[in-house]
Amino acid sequence: MFHRRGAVRPFLSALCLPTCLAFAQDGSVRFEDFSVEPSWLSYRSHLLPNPLPITRQSFGWRDTLPTNGSRGEIGGWIQRSLTPAWYAKVIPARTLNDKLSASGKFSVTRDDSTSGVLVGWFHETSRGWRTPNSLVFRLDGNGGKYWVFYEYGTRHWFTGGGGCFEGDRYQTTPTQPFKADGTTHEWTLTYEPSGAGGNGLMTFILDGKAYPQALAAEHRRDGAEFNRFGICNLQATGSGMEVHFHELTLDSQPLDLSRDPGWEARGNNTEFPERQMRPFHDFGWRPTGKAGGKPGEIGGIIWRDEKPACYATGVETLSLGANLFASGKIAFHGAGSDSGVYLGWFDAASKTNKTTADYHEPQRNLLAILLEGPSRVGHYFRAAYSTRVGHGVIQDSGPILYPDGRSHTWSLHYKSTSGEITVQLDEERTTMVVSPEHRQEGATFDRFGLFNLQAGGHFVDIAIDDLTFTARAAGK
């Protein structure tokens, strides 16, 4: 069973230098710059669906006659994909300090399972799920029926929102979903910066019922910027939806759809074989230089999935009785919500023989960095460990690593005498202690590398370079 605890405090990255030098001098560490492909173990890290499914986008302006009798609408077939697609009006930059309002009507005539469309304000650089710099409502298809959500994302991936149903979760609500039968629904989406005590208030109205959503104070301070208004696909793997929008207004002004409005079209009329889809991992060695700036690194797309996957190198058998150290560079390029990955030491047999989800049976024999966190925050860069019997701890919090593609330095240090684990990201570090009881239970490790969380979820896209790590116990 995993528990959560720990502390976070700022720290100067230069202070890890004595530790680095000490480990280097005793010969217990190994260095990899990945300039050539290493002979690491790849276990289910490169999976390919056969045949490759086809992603199809076919949406935009349509010279059709909606039920109101006025010609022109936007919409069509929109499919979930990690590849972004949108049809949107370019607008002057707006922020969370501006009033926003839009309204219209929509109808869904078909939806396959796991489909999704976002409608509202976003930015041309908005990527991923959940979507930063966005203030939208979402149509979420579930195979002939769909749910409606309203949500926002700030510039640093803070999110908030809710659903148009009773309770907190659509999986347990007594509210019935909408049917994809072409029924027309009316909607209004507004944002008032002075609402909710000055934190900002988002209000979504669907068929006359209002759903207010106050922004968290921290989210308002983080801010967001929008320069597009329109429709875009939900950027996660899945299927498609046929949906149509008409009688649109923006800032209380009607949008003329009687003729082609010439809105910006990106990836909205295309077909391609889909390589990036759950749960088909694609990580290992890469000739790219995203993390270290020079060709050669490891990483790629790693999914949360109930089945095991890893890319790692063998090390001499290590335990909680040995001092452990690792450091390197990391670049985080993309992620969905409910996603994560481990980087550190683990036991190959414990990992590859485990076929149950982590919430039924925790992973055993690991000491690692866990890049993961709640969707309201994003991704913490924090320590985690588990003993040979599966008892362990995940830190409550840690430095937040944003999926913005920037390169960062990091380190992980475990002291066997005190049980202290220190994780550092740039100039911020976190510490926690392996309890005496857990140290007595013990853990063994014979691999170092990347390995997945075995629980259903979404993906992370990372790159690791200039890697130093303990490969044998000191003094051997």
Which positions does each model-derived feature cover?
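Extracellular glycan-recognition surfaces and repeat-rich motifs
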Residues: 41-77, 264-302, 306
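N-terminal secretory signal peptides that target proteins for export/translocation
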Residues: 1-8
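Secretory/extracellular carbohydrate-interaction modules
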Residues: 69-163, 299-387
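Flexible glycan-contacting loops in extracellular carbohydrate-active proteins
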Residues: 214-244, 433-463
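Bacterial N-terminal signal peptides
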Residues: 9-22
